[in-house]
């Protein structure tokens, strides 16, 4: 009788520990994520634009690729969540037409739509990621 009760308690304790570990993993990914809080745009001479993304911590190095037709720059930010109120950000005239910010799974993708593909530079300074297009 005592042995059966001990086995039942041991199984309940193991189940409780497994549940706690599972919940901790689920919640830790959202707690540890860097959050994009704001995005700003500055027009520069020579039909260039500087995009400044502001985060609640130091952002990760972006990984990205470009597409020639239609002209796009896509930057992936692993482990980043977006707190921006809008996904679409029209830029008006000039080569860079719009910026779209989309959260998908464990990353956020930033897409710069352009009239014509040009090179870009990205740099991190404090809690900001600057992209010069």
Language model features by range: what are they?
Residues 2, 6-12, 31-133:
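Signal-peptide-cleaved, periplasmic/extracellular N-terminal interaction regions immediately downstream
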Residues 17-29:
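Bacterial N-terminal signal peptides
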């Amino acid at each position: 009788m005592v042995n059966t009760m001990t086995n039942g308690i041991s199984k309940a304790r193991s189940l409780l520990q497994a549940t706690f570990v599972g919940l901790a993993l689920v919640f830790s990914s959202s707690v540890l994520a860097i959050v994009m809080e704001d995005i700003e745009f500055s027009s520069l001479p020579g039909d260039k634009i500087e995009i400044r993304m502001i985060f609640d911590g130091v952002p990760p190095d972006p990984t990205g690729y470009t597409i020639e037709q239609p002209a796009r720059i896509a930057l992936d930010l692993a482990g980043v969540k977006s707190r921006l109120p809008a996904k679409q950000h029209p830029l008006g005239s000039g080569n860079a037409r719009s910026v779209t910010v989309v959260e998908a799974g464990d990353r956020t993708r930033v897409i710069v739509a352009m009239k014509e593909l040009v090179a870009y530079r990205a740099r991190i300074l404090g809690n900001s990621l600057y992209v010069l297009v």
